[in-house]
Amino acid sequence: CLGAQLRRYDKGGEQFYDQISALHKSVRGSHPDAALYWLTRMLDGGADARYLARRIVRMAWEDIGLADPRAMQIANDAALTYERLGSPEGELALGQAVIYLAVAAKSNAGYNAYNAAKAFVKQDKSREVPVHLRNAPTKLMKELGYGHEYRYAHDEPNAYAAGETYLPDGMAEP
């Protein structure tokens, strides 16, 4: 048809990565209309909906995180719904998930904390588990003091063992 508009899209080239970036940044920027547009544009262009579902789940964990734990459930449920229904019905679940993520409260604190811990562990030496935190399934381990002086948090006021240490020796509490 002469009046048909040509869409700019490629399944793995620059247009693909530009559009997935626009989708992710629209969610991060709390713009549901733009997020839904980019998702729909990619689906219309032939993007693998399973790839998009995976990216939507990642957005929930990376950009919304603990600010709205329900977002992670919705993203996972949308991916599972797509797997169960396929296209085109399952695409609605992906669209609704994108809208929810875009309007959800945002926090990348968990993402940043995990990356900082990962970087620290990679450069740090291997530290021993403190004796009071060690498992003591045998008599010998108990005799060696494994688990001795561990304070069971549920037996403490407000289920909090104030002053108990959980990090390896030599590591300062944050």
Task: List the predicted regions and their residue ranges.
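Extracellular and organelle-lumenal recognition/adhesion modules and their flexible linkers in secreted
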Residues: 1
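Conserved helicase/translocase motor-coupling segment
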Residues: 5-41, 54
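Terminal-proximal interaction/regulatory segments of ATP-powered molecular machines
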Residues: 29-174
